[in-house]
Amino acid sequence: MPSVLLEPNLLGQSNSGVAAQSMEERARTHVPGNVLARFLELRGRQIIKACGTLWYTVPGRFLMSLPYQTMLNLDPDEVRRMIRETRAFGARFPSLSWTGLESGLYVLRHRDYDIGSLHTKHRPRVRRAVQCFEVRTAEKVELLNQGWELNLSTMARQGRYDAEFGDRHRWERFVEAAFACPEIAFPAVFSGPRMAAYMATCREEKWLHILHQMSRQEDLPNFPNHLLTYAVTKQAAVDTSLEAVCYGYVPLFAADGLHEYKLRFGYEMIPHHSAIQLHPSLNLVLNQPATRLAVRIACRLQKHNQHLETLQAVLEGARLSGPSINPC
């Protein structure tokens, strides 16, 4: 099979080799998750340090913890205090010790990774894509123009809209923020000058996080996403400075096809509970059987509505979540 890795490094720069800092200085200044936190902050997200970890705001005025792979066992009183002080609607974090929604993180730790590591249905798709595309890092101007086109194509296909990727000015801010962070990279698939798919990845310490992936509808018959996933995963798998590749959380809405896609590329779904705490005032109103029933009925009437499915999952998570053992 022809090589698909046309560049020595598609994955961005490691933050572990900052020449200007000694190991002692880095130990004092580094906080787990701060690389992704800086990228998010430059994009306009609020970053908070509380409960011994970093948090960032997501649409809906919720807080989520960083880094994604760190399992938390928090004091519920401290979580509620953080939510009140930041005026957030709620917080969500992964835990092995709290109860909550059944969830998980897609992770790959293999060192030996090649075309044979893929599910048999994916192998011919990757081979076909190799004949049609090349893999290289996207340049800023390509992302500003063609990347935005891919965002619109992907969101239209999925029946959703995220202003950060759809609004031209907010997308420009996203790209500028990324290029201010050397750990953020944009591996992409091209047919000549035409971009067919891209990823946004973040390299922090010994983890590579695949943050976003977009593609052009017209190119899907030639499987650009399959080639991109394979190329990035293969390069990360053989990188001895990396411990693991993270392909994101299990989403709060139904996404069976996405789950199967990731597993077929050799990723494992490492289970955990997604713990959700609402603002105490909201909890009194929303964490009620009647409210959950109303949302459940709305989901049945409007099938495949990701916003309603997410709201239903959040309310169910709030009902289920709580510490099962005393916090450390």
Model-assigned labels for residue ranges:
Residues 77, 120-123, 230, 256:
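Residue-level marker for well-ordered alpha-helical positions
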Residues 2-57, 91-100, 104-221, 234-236:
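A conserved beta-strand-loop-helix scaffold within acyl/acetyltransferase catalytic domains
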Residues 2-55, 96-115, 243-328:
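Active-site/acyl-donor-binding loops of N-acyltransferases
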Residues 60-65, 84-91, 243-245:
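Hydrophobic beta-strand segments of well-ordered beta-sheets in folded domains
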Residues 52-53, 58-70:
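STAS-typified acidic loop motif
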Residues 71-80, 168-173, 230:
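Well-ordered, non-membrane alpha-helical segments in soluble/globular domains
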Residues 183-286:
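Aromatic (often tryptophan-rich) hydrophobic motifs at membrane interfaces
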Residues 71-96:
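Extended catalytic core of nucleotide-activated donor transferases of GT-like folds
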